[in-house]
Amino acid sequence: MSGSSPIHVVGGGLAGSEAAWQIAEAGLPVVLHEMRPLRATEAHRTDGLAELVCSNSFRSDDAALNAVGLLHQEMRRLGSLIMRAGDANQVPAGGALAVDREGFSRAVTRALEAHPLVTIAREEIDGLPPASWDSVIVATGPLTAPGLAEAIRGLTGAESLAFFDAIAPIVHRESIDMGVAWFQSRYDKAGPGGTGADYINCPMDRAQYEAFVAALRAGETTSFKEWEASTPYFDGCLPVEVMAERGPETLRHGPMKPFGLTNPHNPTVKAYAIVQLRQDNALGTLYNMVGFQTKLRHAEQVRIFRTIPGLERAEFARLGGLHRNTYLDSPRLLDATLRLKAAPRLRFAGQITGCEGYVESAAVGLMAGRYAAAERRGRALAPLPPTTALGALIAHITGGHVSAEEVGAPRSFQPMNVNFGLFPPLDHAPKAPDGRRLRGPEKAQAKKRALTDRARADLAAWLGEPGLPAAAE
């Protein structure tokens, strides 16, 4: 490989933006190719890099007890642009890290535009990248251009898998009736930049809840195209009406659970179910309906969601929608450094690899950028410890999944959020300071602390090993 020719990154989402940043910070030229605004998608609204098209939440920021919070911490340690921009544009969200989506995208775009080693090319790559590009990271996400997707299928000899992601509505804050609704985080928990009163809560009694569930189940939804009909949903982003169809109590044990919340307007009466809205921009003028991603037709959304107490006069800045997500059978197709086995000049990053979630996509982009930078310099990165959040995620994508052949039954690789189930087990169960065995919640919490403590120690050791690109110093 030539040391002077640029590395190419296709796709300017979270993964591609992070990959390009890591390469440039390692002192190497990189070209970031983004097809917007020349070609729009059904989910994006702007031409900004790293646009958030679904939720504005990066989920929990608790690095001691939560796997995604640990991933946040590891990415910050490795100089993540996505985490830097997220921290600089956070909005209150209880125990979660949520961001002002426009400010976040603007910060990422400006940082990459200002970097002397980054070139942003506004063009579509609708097919295999030219053979002269000897190092390419494909980070085209769930909306990969059809020509490129077909070219990838041709290389791999396999059909890509796909599922649907549904998008939640956003409501204008001033249209919410705060004589009915109230501010409170679940269990009054204050997260990064939060106060413990970061969500707007809309209560329902049993009759209201049952009528709402019935309306969701009867609501008219968008129809599927023939090629979409057999595409499964990802369980972490189910449309609210699909959850309603799974059972009458599913929603009140999911996004509408009433636990940890007290209605100050009527404190002696416990709500049967509660709809929560989370701040969506820094000004606090927009709130998104938590867990209310939907494929209902727009008119149905307005009609049904205005039956929620407090939202009777709701004005919607954006209604919910639906888009298709395509991803690879990565454990079979990719090597340990995210290269396509059939064409090693191509690496993959982000949702197309089968990770799920903004932070996970950016994390895979971060490592793809580092792998590409090390390879360009003729070095090999030491394998990530699978005990770290980054290592556990990469290991799952590139080989940790149990294949159908191994279990003797049909089983497909599915998108995965980072979670402690991906981490190797502890050598010894944690014990209390006095040596006694722990049980119940105390045991679970101690186990999580032990896993995150081990991860921090192992990442520190990995960062001290030779052969890392400059961006990791």
UniProtKB/Swiss-Prot annotation:
Residues 428-452 have a biased composition (Basic and acidic residues). It comes from the Bacteria. It catalyses: uridine(54) in tRNA + (6R)-5,10-methylene-5,6,7,8-tetrahydrofolate + NADH + H(+) = 5-methyluridine(54) in tRNA + (6S)-5,6,7,8-tetrahydrofolate + NAD(+); uridine(54) in tRNA + (6R)-5,10-methylene-5,6,7,8-tetrahydrofolate + NADPH + H(+) = 5-methyluridine(54) in tRNA + (6S)-5,6,7,8-tetrahydrofolate + NADP(+). One of its GO terms (cellular component) is cytosol. Its main location: cytoplasm. GO terms for biological process: tRNA methylation; tRNA wobble uridine modification. InterPro entries: FAD/NAD-bd_sf (IPR036188), MnmG-rel (IPR002218), MnmG-rel_CS (IPR020595), MnmG_N (IPR040131), TrmFO (IPR004417). Residues 425-452 are annotated as: Disordered. Keywords: Cytoplasm, FAD, Flavoprotein, Methyltransferase, NAD, NADP, Transferase, tRNA processing. It is an enzyme of class 2 (transferase). Its cofactor is FAD. The keyword Ion transport does not apply. Its EC number is 2.1.1.74. FAD binds at G11, G12, G13, L14, A15, G16. The keyword Methyltransferase applies. It is found in: Cytoplasm. GO terms for molecular function: flavin adenine dinucleotide binding; tRNA (uracil(54)-C5)-methyltransferase activity, 5,10-methylenetetrahydrofolate-dependent. PANTHER family: GLUCOSE INHIBITED DIVISION PROTEIN A (PTHR11806), METHYLENETETRAHYDROFOLATE--TRNA-(URACIL-5-)-METHYLTRANSFERASE TRMFO (PTHR11806:SF2). Catalyzes the folate-dependent formation of 5-methyl-uridine at position 54 (M-5-U54) in all tRNAs. Belongs to the MnmG family. TrmFO subfamily. HAMAP family: TrmFO (MF_01037). This is Methylenetetrahydrofolate--tRNA-(uracil-5-)-methyltransferase TrmFO. It comes from Methylobacterium sp. (strain 4-46).
